[in-house]
From Swiss-Prot:
It comes from Bacillus anthracis. Zn(2+) binds at H567, H571, C669, H673. It comes from the Bacteria. CDD domains: AlaRS_core (cd00673). The gene is alaS. GO terms for molecular function: alanine-tRNA ligase activity; aminoacyl-tRNA deacylase activity; ATP binding; catalytic activity, acting on a protein; transferase activity; tRNA binding; zinc ion binding. Its main location: cytoplasm. Keywords: Aminoacyl-tRNA synthetase, ATP-binding, Cytoplasm, Ligase, Metal-binding, Nucleotide-binding, Protein biosynthesis, RNA-binding, tRNA-binding, Zinc. Its cofactor is Zn(2+). It holds the Pfam family tRNA_SAD. This is Alanine--tRNA ligase.
Amino acid sequence: MKQLTGAQIRQMFLDFFQEKGHAVEPSASLVPHEDPSLLWINSGVATLKKYFDGRVIPQNPRITNAQKSIRTNDIENVGKTARHHTFFEMLGNFSIGDYFKEEAITWAWEFLTSDKWIGFDKELLSVTIHPEDEEAFTIWNEKMGVPKERIIRLEENFWDIGEGPSGPNTEIFYDRGEAYGNDFSDPELYPGGENERYLEVWNLVFSQFNHNPDGSYTPLPKKNIDTGMGLERMTSIVQDVPTNFDTDLFMPMIGATETISGEKYRNGDLEKDMAFKVIADHIRTVTFAVGDGALPSNEGRGYVLRRLLRRAVRYSKKLNINRPFMFELVPVVGEVMKDFYPEVLEKKDFIAKVVKNEEERFHETLHDGEAILSEVIAKAKEEKTTVISGVDAFRLYDTYGFPIELTEEYAEEAGMTVDHEGFENEMEKQRERARAARQDVDSMQVQGGVLGEVKVASEFVGYGTVATESNVVALVKNGEYTDSLQVGEEGQLMLDVTPFYAESGGQIADRGCLLADGVKVLVKDVQKAPNGQNLHQVVVEEGTLTKDAAVKAIIDTKNRSSVVKNHTATHLLHQALKDVLGTHVNQAGSLVTSERLRFDFSHFGQVQADELEKIERIVNEKIWESIDVEISQKAIEEAKEMGAMALFGEKYGDVVRVVQVGDYSLELCGGCHVDNTASIGIFKIVAESGIGAGIRRIEAVTGKSAYELMNDQVGLLKEAAGKMKTNPKDILTRVDGLFAEVKQLQKENESLAAKLSNIEAGNLTDSVMTVDGVNVLAAKVNVADMNNLRTMMDDLKNKLESAVVVLASVNDDKVNILAGVTKDLISQGYHAGKLVKEVASRCGGGGGGRPDMAQAGGKNPAQVEEALAFVQEYVKSVSK
């Protein structure tokens, strides 16, 4: 058998079938774009459904591919077993009504056994078939020469997912030898059984029947072939390694994790081996998924990514990794996969940023959640129960963002379980509260009662008209029809023709008035009625308004002018965000008022100051270029072909309104806009913030509001300069001088603190105790921060030469703990990381680190003395 890399096997497979007249289908994105039923692309055939069901006729009925796939239904088994993965590659060859069994079997055998290709020993291959598939038996036995004792008939060799194409399948198994199993009394030791010796190499499915609604099977007029070979499993066989994780597809990530952690893979510790495997698997999945456009969040595929990253971080603690590190593995994945997936390396910086951002968020979550969970577990044990209540599990999830899966894993380690039913009950209560809140909001809208009965037409003409003659066609007061509204009364009305824009697409409604002889009506708001008409919220200021009255409808043009400036600016901002941050940016919400604009968008981390500056400059440059804004009606397909940006989740009709700003911005939009970007005047970003997982918000102003803001800022600058007795242009020099003075004072303060620390360290040596022949010092000290604590620790370790030292300090009701072990005692089994974790857990905290030095935090200062007392117990337990 040849020595081949995973990349060589993949390419060899595609080359083989290309020689057999197959077209190579590119590996599709993991995020399905044509199949809403799938969360992820999860098999090689998933992207080819359009061909198999006849919606699309392929140019070539013979297809081959190497398809990246994600499956997370067995996530808890990843790392525990030899071959479970969340990300894998499926190699396949497919026939859409062209060749069938004989060719599929013949080519599979040729690829596996020919010296030109894989070169397996034929004697080590066995096959399984369906008991009634005599055709497959004949091909295997008579044409391929496989002896009948190596052709196993199994009932489960039938591919059927309900109604639709189905048929028997044949699987090919490789015998890895007695080293992987030689107990022939084991009922599972056969090709197709649960064992490590006979591994499935390839599954060939023969779609030859149609499963009818009545349960019967009839022959398909066109028979299809669908085969699948897992690249990772095939590589483990070719490279003769015990698991998929030991192949060159995973070992570079495991090796990098060894370097980061200082731990060794396959060093006799099964728990650590599992951690290495989980990390290697999950970073592959996350790297590819983010590269294909998915981002961590709290729902859907985003939650899958968050769960995988957090599970990997959780396992990394078993390797004493207590910092963000997964992002460092992204370029390693890119290098491994670059031959077939060069885009991973191209996007590595972006992917690494996403991963690092998520890791940092989770480390904060872990710190708080672990401390609370430790208390919950301790409380449960005190109450003599082995079940963590659903209420506690929900509190961890809802308040601290601690995933239920992690709570379950921690509970399992402590020999406990989680009340899942109770947790789900709490989740349902939360959903009910959310539904009730939504109902409360809806009840405030003017979309109930008689309004649902109003079918009269109302035409909106406000894109090009600011005033129009109109008639009141419906008048409502307190949810009931009325014939009139008197002075001071409020109500709702519909006009047969209206220039008033109804709030939608983030743009607020127009304001204005209705005028008639002796009548003046203020229009306060406009919303969409249940049947789509513009519904005006009004108050009568003069006279009496009657149903069927003829009125002149006039919008507040000053207000509209400010609104349209801000709306067109959001379009420019959207494109500028994509230009600066990347094409992953998508609109997640907006608000356009006359005073300001607010734009929410998908992005993995805080937008940096220099990025904000670039974004702001781009928008202003487009304003100053005086670009015409063109608005047109297009067929939806034509608009998409033009590249128009559509809002995710928004439903559009067959004909859409396209807003185009020169050749810079192209969006589907029903709102109001300026005729030329010059009308916007100036654009100024006011704030940037995060409003949820993977969602950022920019607030900005334009025109007069931007001028007033900048004028205020100049005023503040002048005032600050006056207080510092300088002029505005020299203010930075003055600030730098003040900083230098402060820095010098800090330096003097630190020097004094170091001297005091050294004196205190000298005094502490008098408190050293000997426990079972080991010098032990556990003390509460007065220092300002962790840096001073480290300085004191170094002084003590140098003075004592051989000792176990634990120092704790309390500042602002927070506990800092530092443990240190000298080199000679590390070899005797003393471990600072394990010790500090135990000490911290006794004062409401958590932490860990290296054998020689480790830090932790706590939340209960009153328990510090009691926690430090444990140090002697620890030393005694290790010395036994």
